[in-house]
Curated annotation (Swiss-Prot):
Function, in words: One of the primary rRNA binding proteins, it binds directly to 16S rRNA where it nucleates assembly of the head domain of the 30S subunit. Is located at the subunit interface close to the decoding center, probably blocks exit of the E-site tRNA.
Protein name: Small ribosomal subunit protein uS7
Keyword Signal included in the entry's annotation: no
Domain of life: Bacteria
UniProt KW keywords: Ribonucleoprotein, Ribosomal protein, RNA-binding, rRNA-binding, tRNA-binding
GO biological process, one term: translation
Higher taxonomy: Bacteria, Bacillati, Cyanobacteriota, Cyanophyceae, Synechococcales
Record-linked PANTHER family: RIBOSOMAL PROTEIN S7
Protein family per UniProt: Belongs to the universal ribosomal protein uS7 family.
């Protein structure tokens, strides 16, 4: 890794099928062992199932689900004089979105269901309705930050 300067962040191009940047990011999180076409198929099937069940626009529901699962604050460990404090910090938008996508995929994988598409569709619909494990994780993260508010002055 170069010490000279940080690598330039490449822009995320919108997904060719859904014309959506978040869909591209979701495909990247779903992908295992470089199998991008399989990940795209899973997302497309999940959107099909969402459309079937709700009758609404799956992209709209997907964006709502991500918004509902995105944390605004998190706690980070900070050592001060031999003690480790959980310091609450604001989450940048990019990191928040990445965390939400990661949680949605991980909790989808741990769900009981037939296929990954069914599990992902279920988790996305739950998140859009402010339920589900990803939203619960966000609330948990916010509670932790609220409980450790006293250490906010240790922010770096």
């Amino acid at each position: 890794m170069s010490r000279r300067n940080a690598a330039e962040k490449r822009p995320v191009l919108p997904d060719p099928q859904f014309n959506n940047r978040l869909a591209t990011m979701m495909v990247a999180r779903l992908m295992k062992h470089g199998k991008k076409s399989t990940a795209q198929k899973i997302l497309s099937q999940a959107f099909g199932l969402i459309n079937e069940r709700t009758g609404g626009d799956p992209i709209e529901l997907f964006e709502t689900a991500i918004k509902n699962a995105t944390p605004l604050v998190e706690v980070r460990a900070r050592r001060v004089g031999g003690a480790t404090y959980q310091v609450p910090m604001e989450v940048r938008q990019e990191r928040g979105t990445a965390m939400a996508l990661r949680w949605l995929v991980n909790f989808s994988r741990s769900r009981n269901g037939r296929s990954m598409a069914h599990k992902l569709a279920g988790e996305l619909m739950d998140a859009a309705n402010e339920a589900g494990n990803a939203v619960r994780k966000r609330e948990e993260t916010h509670k932790m930050a609220e409980a450790n508010k006293a250490f906010a002055h240790y922010r770096y």
